[in-house]
Amino acid sequence: MAKGYWMTAYREILDAEKLSAYVALAADAVQANGGRFLVRGGQMQPKEHAVAERTVLVEFDSYEAALATYASPAYQKALEALDGGVVRDLRIVEGID
């Protein structure tokens, strides 16, 4: 079974307090569903017209688990806390078997 991933590029952080609240809630939701943070901030070198302040990559045991975590009540609560505090691009993708 192919793994699932959340790939997130934060383009702009508008409210650091909202982001901090989101991070705490989202981390709990992700870990409760078996997600593992592979990249969480750190050094990066944007290329090919990329603009990013922060990058996050989360791995799940399956694509379905990645989708289910996003839809979970715990993660939806995290999104409510974020409430426009960032401009980002989050994609849920299926890995290669």
Protein language model regions, located:
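Short S/T/G/P-rich N-terminal loop/turn motif that feeds into the first structured element of a domain
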Residues: 1-54, 61-71, 94-97
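C-terminal structural segments of small proteins and small subunits
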Residues: 63-91
